Structures are given as structure tokens and as C-alpha cells.
Amino acid sequence: MRRLTMYPEQPDENRESIVMPLFEVVVYPKSRAKFLADKVTGEILLNDMKNAESVSAIGLTVKNGTKASDLSEESLYKIGNLLNITYVQPSDDGYLVVAKGIERVEAVSLYQKNGLFYATYRPVHDLPDFDEDAETEVMANIKKTIHEISARFQGSEQFTKSIDKMDSIDQIMGFVMPYIPVKLAEKQRLLELASVRERYLLFLHILTKHKENINLQIEMAKKVTDKISKSNREAMLREQLKVIQEELNEGDDSASGDAAYREKIENSTMPDEVKKKAFSELKKLETGGSHNPEAPGIRNYLDLLLDLPWITEEKKSIDIAEARRVLESNHNGLEKVKERIIQHLAVMKLKHEKQGSILLLIGPPGTGKTSLGKSIADALGRKYIRISLGGVKDEAEIRGHRRTYIGALPGRIIQGMRKAGTKNPVFILDEVDKLSASYSGDPASALLEVLDPEQNSTFSDHYLEIPYDLSDVLFIATANSMANIPWPLLDRMETIEISGYTKNEKLAIAKDHLVPCILEDHGLDAEKLKIEDEALKVIIDKYTREAGVRGLKKQLAKTARFVSEKIVSGKADLPYVVRADMLKEILGKEIIRQEEARKENVPGVVTGLAWTPVGGDILFIEGTFMPGSGKLTLTGQLGDVMKESAKISLSLVRSRLANTANSFDFTSSDIHIHVPSGATPKDGPSAGVTLFTALTSLIIGKAVDPKLAMTGEITLSGAVLPVGGIKEKVLAAHRAGIKKIILPKENERDLEDVPEDARNELQFVPVETIEEVLREALDIDLPRPVVPSSYPGSSYAPAHSV
């Protein structure tokens, strides 16, 4: 977040600024606020922040009950705040804006322009009608009232400490009012009062009324509790008497239980400093008496200390051959991934397992990331522990809760170590990309200490309160995408990418792993159910669309349930053989429409290649033109980068084809480019060559072979740059029936990752320039760039190509 300078004092003449309509928010001077801005306003503020040291706006609260679609000048209060915009960030609902109130202002006039509100405003000055002694007395009463309110809520100490440090009633008002449940009009009235005396006394009145409401609610709750019927009260007393009698009879057992703790601690493998802590807690337990309310919490804490593994067991030597055998038997395909894991284990063996590298397995859902972690544990002969971090928003989930809170628990890391019972398990941190920050802290930041080899030997859990050594643990994290993983966390891990399975690999996995597993889960065997290979191929192609095999497993389970019902009903002859033509009856209609290469040749239509989180896909780029004024229209939910690629492509076409025999009047024609599947957002630079080829094909009226696909980024100088996701894109082209692929020359080395069966059935054309692209796609030689006639030929020199 960049810091912006404050504004210098200015004379009181009217000034003009953009207006930020504030829904359900009133911002006070000297206070900070967060609110959402619409996309247009947010983009303006973001752009201004890039070009200016400080950015301001007028914050005017929207009157209650007004919808965003019904905003008008009359729906805004005229008294607001001059805001210093300190932070603007895109979000799902618009733009998140953080601002600080500078001074109260009045909107002298309001008007709309291009869907935005603007105001001419002037400062609203305070009426200094309060002497210093009276103000000091009111501030003391305000702080006292806030302390009385806060005392009713647990964990409010930090809040009141912040209040005590403030030396201005206006500052306290801006800090406290967002938490007071009063009507919006009342909050606005507090802002509009120019009289310092009236404003401060109204604020004190609001606080006092809020305190009385809280006291009333507590009193009413107490009265409801006191209205328990006499019979229920007697029953409760009888139960209490019974418990007291049992406690009195078993007092010796309780004492012996505490003595057992002492013996267990003395005989444990805890380090000396941990034993010292345990004996300190035990002393509290022994001296607290039978009525000690902390006794259950102390016993839980001592149980945790006794259950945790404190010493490293004798380590087994890593058997690389056995590790390779386990990985090969449990996982088809993923040869490079398995080789990376074997190399990692070899390093551990040479370093005697005292390693600092953390593995991160990244790949689409269902590609075996978690099961790879289980296989590594099996190969090492270690305990396997897995925790899912998807949706975790609270830092306490990682670090634990402090024991001062009721129901406090250790964090998931310490709980996992307790469950493992050994100091060197294989610990899977599943879905680390699904962590998210909230008001309760950032769990991703808490993981930094866990995954940093320099720090995790003294990991601090809030519940445990003493350092715990995690350096012997082999942590393996999994994620679907690294885009949502904070860079400091990503920097601490060694990334292994799992791109997904080919059709042949999925078929092998289904035959060797999934089908036997499904048969066992449904009480079947190979003598009762057989699924033909062709049927498996149809299920893979027509009933699943994924990089992994999780959906395939679900469809096979559905097939097994269908057959089980047939067998139990006596309607099936054994073995029941599932053929491809039977799948419609078993699984219903085909649910996946695979994109396939088009059969017809149409000028302006070219096949491109795309990467998605579930693998690759092909896409079609279509172009057409009509009489107009030289406008370019782009549709199909294209992102900013893809739109820029389209503009670059059009500029290249205009510069290279302007004086050809196929002369095309760009100034009197509009061009429309569309990318089908309009409901799916698309972005990235890799469609550059496809867009350029589609435009060229459209202009010269010559069609591109529908069995040809291409990918690559282009520059204004006509160079073709490398792109990512080559393996997934090539596999998608192979599935779709594409025969030839144009790709950047620098991506030629990425073809090594493509399975050999797919490589052998495709022709690859590596290119470095757009001239090579058109020569291969349209069989034409592209003219040299047109130099404007106004250029002085003798002094022309080509620009440096970045």
C-alpha cells in the first residue's frame, strides 16, 4: 500500500472534486474507513494514485433506503468529508477503497457526468463554543462510558487501550461510531453539527444510551434465567448435590490422579525446560483445590505435553529402490514428477534426512497430489498426517488459541504432531492456495514460520506456549494454483508441477487402480462386472472433463451401483459386461461436448489453443467485417491482455497489408472479432498469433486449414514470443483431432513434456516471426512494414525492439 501525502491548507473558496457515494457509512474527520466503490470510480482513483502523490474525493453518505441504481443528487446528504484516498484494490464487487477523513465539507452543488457524481464544495468550520475545561470533563466522561461498555465484552482490552491513547474527542468519535448500532440519520446528524458543544454532548448521549441498552439486555437475560420453574430448580439442585457427594467420596482418586501426572512427567522424554513448565502447571492443579475452575484446562494442557513426541526416533535408512517401486505401483504416468520426488529423497538420504526443503505439489484437482504425499510416507516408512487448509481464515487454526480463552485448543500443526506420535512424520498441508486472511489474522503468514527451515525448529503455538521443534518433519503442501499463494510462502517451497493425465494414462489408471477399487467398494469382483476398454474411453471422453481422474472415479462408481442393482434384482447374467453402447442407459446422456476441429474452411476463422485449470482446450477465433468507420469490436468475455493482443494484431495487419493487391479500406470498415463460449472469461497473450492470422485470413479472403491450431504471443515488431501451458495445449489439440500445431520456436523444448504417443501423431511447426506463421497457415509471403511517406528516408533507423 503506498503512502500519500496530506493536503496543505487551502483558502475557503469553493473547490471541485469527484464524489464517492457511501452506502450505510458515515466518515468522520480524523477517522479511517473502508468501503466499496463502483468499477468506473475505482479505476479513476487507481489511475490517479499512479500519477499523483495524493488523491482526494468527497465522501457523501447516501440517504437510507436508496438503491445504487436509483442514485441522484437528492439522495445524497450535502454534508460529508474530504477524503484522503490511501488504498484502492480491485475486488469481486467493485473496488475496495481505504480512506481517511480530513475535514468536514459541504457540497454547494452536485452534478453528474459520465455516470459519476462531482461536487463543488467548501469547508465546514467548527463553531468553537466549548471551553477547554468543559471539553476535558466531557472527554473523561466519554472514555469512562466506553470503558463501562467494553467491560461487558470479553477481549476488549486492546480496544480501550487505543481509546486511552487518543487526545481528541473527534478522533474517538471516528473510531467508535462505526461500532454503535444507531440509525444512519443519527450518525449523519453527528457529522453535520457545527457546534462543538452540541456535537460532543450528542456523542456522549449516544454512548450513554447505548450503555443503558446493553445493561437492559443483560438484565432481561438474567430475569429470564431466574424464571426457571421451582420443579426444574429443585431437580437441578438434586443433581448438584449428587455430584458433590460423588466428588467427596472420590477425593482420594482425584489426588491420586494428580500424583499420576507427576509420575508421568518425571518418566517422560520431555526436554528439561518443558518438564519445568509441566511441573509449574501441575503445582497450580495441586494447590487450586477441588473447586479450581482452571483444573480441566490444566489437565488438558498436561495431557497435550505428555502426548506430544519430544525426541527423534531412530531413523530408517531411505531405500531409493523401494521408494521408486512404491511410486510406480501407486501412480500411472507423472514420470517427471516421480523422478523429481526420487531426486528429492536421494538428497535427503545423502544429508541423513536433516533437510530443509519443503515440497509444493501444484496441479489441477484429481491429479493425485495428496495420494503422492501418502506414497512418499509409505516409501519412507513414516507416519502420514494430513490437514486440509481450504477455507481457513483464522490464524489461530495454525498457531492455536491462547489458553486464557474458554475452549482453547492447540493449532492444527500441533494437533497433527500429537496424532502422529512421532517427530518425523510426512505432513501434508492440503489446499494451501485456499487460505484467506480475515479480521482474525492471516493464516498464510502463520505458515511462514512452519515452513521456514531456519525458524521451524522453534515453532511457537499460542496454546503450547513453549517452542516446539518441527525440523524433522517432511512437509508437503498441495495446491491447484500458485496464483493465490503469497510470494513469501511460495518462496519457502520447492515447486513440483503436476499438469494432468493423457487419455491413455487415464485409461491405464482406470484399469489398474480405479476399477479394482470401485469393485471392492461395491461388493463386486471381476467375475461379476467387467468394463470394456472402449467403454472406459467413452466415459473418459464424453462423461468427464478434467485433468485428473476424480470425476472418472465417480462415473465408474455410478456404473457399479447400476450393475449392483441389476445383480440383486436377478436381472443380470454374470459376468455383467459393460460396453460402450450401454453407457447411455447406465450414465444417461453424454454430458461433455468436446471441442473438435471444424470441418469447413471459412476465411476469418482460426483455431487457437488455451490453458485452463482443468487442462487444455481449443478455442476458435472468428472475424468478420462490415461497412463502418474503422472501429474494432471484441466480444467473448476477453480480458485486458487479450484485448491488447487483438489491437496489436490489427496494427500489424494494417501496417503490413495496407498496400497489397488485396487492398482493404480499414477506415470505412468495422471489424468484429468474437471468441465463442461467451460465458467463459478468457485472457492472456498466447492468442496473439491466432488473432493476427484470423484478421489476415479475413482481409485477404483465404481460409486456414481447420486441422491447424496455433499459440504464441506477438509483438508490434512481428516477433513470436514463448507462452506457457504447452503440454496441456498440445494434449487438447490431440484430443480435438488437430493434425498440425504452430508454436513459438522457444517453446520447442517444452514438447519433451508431451507424451510420446501424442507427439507422434502431430506435426509441430516452430516459428519466430509472423512471416513464418502466415507462410505456414495461409501460404503467403507477408510484405515488409510500410514506412510512412513523411519519414525522411535518409535518417530513418529502426527502433530498438524490446
From Swiss-Prot:
<dbReference type="InterPro" id="IPR054594">
    <property type="entry name" value="Lon_lid"/>
</dbReference>
<comment type="subunit">
    <text>Homohexamer. Organized in a ring with a central cavity.</text>
</comment>
<feature type="domain" description="Lon N-terminal">
    <location>
        <begin position="17"/>
        <end position="211"/>
    </location>
</feature>
<dbReference type="InterPro" id="IPR003111">
    <property type="entry name" value="Lon_prtase_N"/>
</dbReference>
<feature type="active site">
    <location>
        <position position="729"/>
    </location>
</feature>
<feature type="domain" description="Lon proteolytic">
    <location>
        <begin position="600"/>
        <end position="780"/>
    </location>
</feature>
<dbReference type="Pfam" id="PF22667">
    <property type="entry name" value="Lon_lid"/>
</dbReference>
<dbReference type="Pfam" id="PF00004">
    <property type="entry name" value="AAA"/>
</dbReference>
<keyword id="KW-0067">ATP-binding</keyword>
<dbReference type="InterPro" id="IPR027417">
    <property type="entry name" value="P-loop_NTPase"/>
</dbReference>
<dbReference type="GO" id="GO:0005524">
    <property type="term" value="F:ATP binding"/>
</dbReference>
<comment type="function">
    <text>ATP-dependent serine protease that mediates the selective degradation of mutant and abnormal proteins as well as certain short-lived regulatory proteins. Required for cellular homeostasis and for survival from DNA damage and developmental changes induced by stress. Degrades polypeptides processively to yield small peptide fragments that are 5 to 10 amino acids long. Binds to DNA in a double-stranded, site-specific manner.</text>
</comment>
<keyword id="KW-0346">Stress response</keyword>
<dbReference type="GO" id="GO:0043565">
    <property type="term" value="F:sequence-specific DNA binding"/>
</dbReference>
<keyword id="KW-0720">Serine protease</keyword>
<dbReference type="GO" id="GO:0004252">
    <property type="term" value="F:serine-type endopeptidase activity"/>
</dbReference>
<dbReference type="InterPro" id="IPR046336">
    <property type="entry name" value="Lon_prtase_N_sf"/>
</dbReference>
<dbReference type="Pfam" id="PF05362">
    <property type="entry name" value="Lon_C"/>
</dbReference>
<keyword id="KW-0547">Nucleotide-binding</keyword>
<keyword id="KW-0378">Hydrolase</keyword>
<dbReference type="Pfam" id="PF02190">
    <property type="entry name" value="LON_substr_bdg"/>
</dbReference>
<dbReference type="InterPro" id="IPR003959">
    <property type="entry name" value="ATPase_AAA_core"/>
</dbReference>
<dbReference type="InterPro" id="IPR020568">
    <property type="entry name" value="Ribosomal_Su5_D2-typ_SF"/>
</dbReference>
<dbReference type="GO" id="GO:0034605">
    <property type="term" value="P:cellular response to heat"/>
</dbReference>
<comment type="similarity">
    <text>Belongs to the peptidase S16 family.</text>
</comment>
<keyword id="KW-0645">Protease</keyword>
<feature type="active site">
    <location>
        <position position="686"/>
    </location>
</feature>
<dbReference type="GO" id="GO:0006515">
    <property type="term" value="P:protein quality control for misfolded or incompletely synthesized proteins"/>
</dbReference>
<dbReference type="InterPro" id="IPR015947">
    <property type="entry name" value="PUA-like_sf"/>
</dbReference>
<dbReference type="InterPro" id="IPR027543">
    <property type="entry name" value="Lon_bac"/>
</dbReference>
<dbReference type="InterPro" id="IPR027065">
    <property type="entry name" value="Lon_Prtase"/>
</dbReference>
<dbReference type="InterPro" id="IPR008268">
    <property type="entry name" value="Peptidase_S16_AS"/>
</dbReference>
<dbReference type="GO" id="GO:0004176">
    <property type="term" value="F:ATP-dependent peptidase activity"/>
</dbReference>
<protein>
    <recommendedName>
        <fullName>Lon protease</fullName>
        <ecNumber>3.4.21.53</ecNumber>
    </recommendedName>
</protein>
<keyword id="KW-0963">Cytoplasm</keyword>
<dbReference type="InterPro" id="IPR014721">
    <property type="entry name" value="Ribsml_uS5_D2-typ_fold_subgr"/>
</dbReference>
<dbReference type="GO" id="GO:0016887">
    <property type="term" value="F:ATP hydrolysis activity"/>
</dbReference>
<dbReference type="InterPro" id="IPR004815">
    <property type="entry name" value="Lon_bac/euk-typ"/>
</dbReference>
<feature type="binding site">
    <location>
        <begin position="363"/>
        <end position="370"/>
    </location>
    <ligand>
        <name>ATP</name>
    </ligand>
</feature>
<dbReference type="InterPro" id="IPR003593">
    <property type="entry name" value="AAA+_ATPase"/>
</dbReference>
<dbReference type="GO" id="GO:0005737">
    <property type="term" value="C:cytoplasm"/>
</dbReference>
<dbReference type="InterPro" id="IPR008269">
    <property type="entry name" value="Lon_proteolytic"/>
</dbReference>
